[in-house]
Amino acid sequence: QFLDAEGGGLLEFCRLPFFSLSLFSTPPMSDITYSWNEYIRLNEELVYKVAKSGWQFDCLICLSRGGMRPGDFFSRIYGKPLAVLATSSYREAKGTVQSNLDIAECMTGLAELKGKVLLVDDMVDSGKTIQEVVAHLKKRYPAITEIRVAVLWWKAHSVLKPDWHCVYFEDSPWIHQPFECYDDLGAEAFSEAIESGKTLGRLQ
């Protein structure tokens, strides 16, 4: 049980013996790959940091697709509905180069946005995406009083500093997340892999 009787606390969760995630710090490199176990641990650490800060939020928003998994951790542990806002900027060079940002007009999961908002994503890279999303939300939903940002990874060249993060990179490695094994695989190739006995998303 993570929630107290009123559903407003994270009593047992905050007592868990979390250790520093500095073990995930790495020397400068162009690519870094995370296993499922490391990825899950990062998500738990992020929720823990927000919980221990004592800051309470009224609404929870994640950015699609990168923020959906971290957002799900927050939604389940806090017992709050998760709103999903679709954004897209990585399009060129097979998804590794940022182009113009598109922000969806509609958001799923919440009928009304107001009060304090926690915005969750997987990383702050250039920082421009979250910066534009924050401006968009404040303009479109004037009842919002405060927006704070929580991410797994924060890169030094970002124009925005998140309120909470797990790993800080002084350089700008390309981060490979464990579920990328499914990217652009296609239903036919996926089916063939499963039929041949392969487990693409195995725990590592």
Regions found by a protein language model. Name each.
Residues Q1, G9-Q204:
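PRPP-associated nucleotide enzymes
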